[in-house]
A protein has these predicted regions:
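Short amphipathic alpha-helical segments that mediate assembly, nucleic-acid/protein binding
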Residues: 2-3, 313
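Sec-dependent N-terminal signal peptides
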Residues: 3-13
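N-terminal secretory/targeting leader peptides
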Residues: 17-107, 123-333
Length: 333
């Protein structure tokens, strides 16, 4: 009898329908991001031998990040990859978006790694399983004219993404004249000369072809843009343990690859590819750099808990101090 029950159980498992996770991202199809996303889906299906599949809706087909998030909550999608929505689900991730706090991509990756247990729990409480974090990159300045002083930057109309509340608050507190709109409205407003400059990640400017419409870029890291990959608890929890492990392992490979690709692409763009497109590289005077970071610190201090819990900011600053000290000691060896 036990043998018959075991046989029936095995037959039931063998005949089980493959599970398909419906995922969304606003990454335009044909970009390096989209290719990495599709490679992740292929890896999941291959390793699971077809038992688990990931179907992606790219290029904003499922709506912007907030619309897609609502669709996940209503069961129309199972997960999402992106940037702005991540901070809504895991508020501590706002620490990675604070302007003027980080000098390199590696610093953000280090901090997010240290915060991962906290982030995992915040995602879980919001109804999601955290498959991983990554970094799109550092926002740099694109403009119609070269900007060499803080006074010139404050006098310039500056575009800010409507789904980026942390940078919106900081930019306004720093005295910038902000024009807020969606990504879809970015190019039409630029062509109408509704604004004259914007901060964004180099690979983002390339993906949305914004770099073909501007004239100058200045390479100094103003803010960092973190990313995440999540699946709803409702979709993740029922998965067999083996499929959960496969999904997590494939996601880890994807996030590592995402960081590598983003780093390589951004470095190539700011070190020559943009200039081949016709952009001119505007130098960043030390005074502008110093004044920008000083203004960013004043904004962080003044906004306080409106941006991030003071205790979390203090903890992150301590982490950064430790990381930078480790790097200094390593260079002396």
């Amino acid at each position: 009898m036990r043998a018959l029950a075991a046989l029936l159980l095995l037959t039931s498992v063998a005949e089980a329908e493959p599970v398909t996770l419906r995922m969304a991202a606003i990454a335009p199809d044909g970009t390096e991001w989209a290719r990495s996303i599709k490679a992740f889906a292929r890896d999941v299906e291959s390793v699971s031998k077809g038992e688990l599949k990931v179907k992606w809706y790219l290029g904003g087909i499922a709506g912007d990040e907030m619309v897609a998030l609502e669709r996940v909550k209503h069961g129309q999608l199972d997960g999402q990859a992106g940037a702005s929505f991540c901070q809504r689900l895991a508020p501590s991730l706002r620490a990675a978006r604070l302007g003027g706090l980080y000098q390199t991509r590696e610093e953000v990756i280090y901090v997010m790694g240290r915060l991962k247990p906290v982030l995992d729990e915040e995602f879980r409480k919001s109804g999601f399983f955290n498959l991983g974090q990554a970094v799109f990159g550092a926002d740099v300045l694109f403009s119609r004219q070269p900007i060499r002083t803080m006074e010139e930057l404050r006098a310039t109309r500056l575009w800010v993404w409507s789904l980026d509340p942390i940078w919106q608050q900081m930019a306004q507190e720093m005295g910038f004249h902000t024009i807020i709109s969606s990504i879809e409205e970015h190019s039409p407003l630029w062509r109408k000369k509704s604004y004259d400059a914007f901060f964004t990640v180099p690979s983002v400017a390339l993906a949305y072809q914004w770099s073909t419409e501007t004239a100058y870029y200045s390479d100094f890291p103003a803010t960092m843009l973190p990313a995440c990959l999540v699946v709803s608890n409702a979709a993740f929890d029922p998965l067999p343990t083996e499929l959960k492990q496969i999904l997590q392992a494939s996601a880890a490979k994807f996030m590592n690859r995402f960081n590598e690709i983003s780093t390589q692409l951004d470095e190539a763009l700011v070190n020559g590819l943009f200039e081949k497109q016709g952009l001119k590289r505007a130098s960043v005077p030390p005074e502008l750099r110093a004044e920008f970071y000083a203004a960013a610190k004043r904004a962080r201090d003044k906004l306080g808990a409106a941006l991030i819990a003071p205790a979390l900011l203090s903890s992150v600053e301590k982490m950064l101090g430790e990381f930078r000290q480790q790097r200094r000691e390593a260079t002396k060896r």
